[in-house]
A protein has these predicted regions:
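Active-site beta-loop-alpha junctions of metal-dependent nucleic acid enzymes
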Residues: 36-60
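Secondary-structure transition/capping motifs at alpha-helix termini
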Residues: 54-63, 94-98
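Mobile-element integrase/transposase regions
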Residues: 1-34, 45-46, 183, 187-200
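Acidic/histidine-rich, metal-coordinating catalytic segments
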Residues: 60-80
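Short conserved beta-strand segments at catalytic cores or DNA/RNA-binding microdomains
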Residues: 18-32, 39, 66, 91, ...
Length: 204
């Protein structure tokens, strides 16, 4: 689970202002079957939504997710002691997934997705660089078309596509999706006042 360093511009039709869409990438470990999703931020909410969209794309849930140490997933990761973002941990509990963040400065822990990100930059993002997008939905439509092509392309080493390898190697071991999709929650620490009221977002 990772984000691409390359982004795609989104143009506001009314103002002409340009924002940078963030490109989320997941790669399944055995098959290399890849999912790509664009969002406007790398916020916890957008990150979790992209993770869940990946589960629905795959049609199931893996045993383990290996995210990078971005704040949307990991609060701290020092000397083997990991503190996950509360919302991300809550999502993982909902789907019964273990989260094992990559160790800081150990790129081999997520080498599969790093290779996947580079391939996606080359096969998808570079092909979209001369397109103009006015919203992220338009961008995701085009990404999905190219993603199908990418996953169906033969992997020379195996003489099979990532889609074929997925059906053989990963799909049989995915856990079924929960009947109810996870609903994002924000977790906040609050102090109870002497009047027993709790203040949230500045409102008593």
């Amino acid at each position: 689970v990772d984000y691409s360093g390359l982004t795609i511009p989104i143009v506001n039709q009314r103002t002409g202002e340009i924002s940078k869409a963030q490109i989320f990438v997941t790669v399944l470990g055995a098959s290399g079957y890849t999912y790509v999703h664009a969002s406007m931020t790398q916020s916890t909410k957008d990150f979790i939504n992209s993770n869940i969209n990946a589960f629905y794309f795959y049609g199931g849930v893996p045993n383990i997710l290996v995210p990078d140490n971005l704040k949307a997933a990991v609060i701290s990761n020092k000397k083997g002691i990991v503190k996950l973002n509360d919302a991300y941990a809550d999502m993982a509990r909902h789907y019964g997934i273990a989260i094992e963040p990559a160790r800081p400065y150990k790129p081999q822990d997520k080498s599969k997705v790093e290779l996947g990100v580079k391939a996606i930059q080359r096969w998808i993002l570079m092909r979209l660089r001369h397109h103009t997008f006015f919203n992220v939905d338009q961008l995701n439509e085009e990404i999905n078309k190219l993603l199908d092509f990418y996953n169906l392309k033969k992997v020379r080493r195996f003489n099979k596509s990532r889609t074929e390898l997925f059906e053989l190697l990963d799909k049989p071991y995915l856990h079924p999706l929960r009947a109810n999709r996870y609903v994002y929650k924000e977790f906040k620490k609050a102090t109870v006042g002497i009047d027993y009221h709790v203040e949230l977002l500045g409102n008593g």
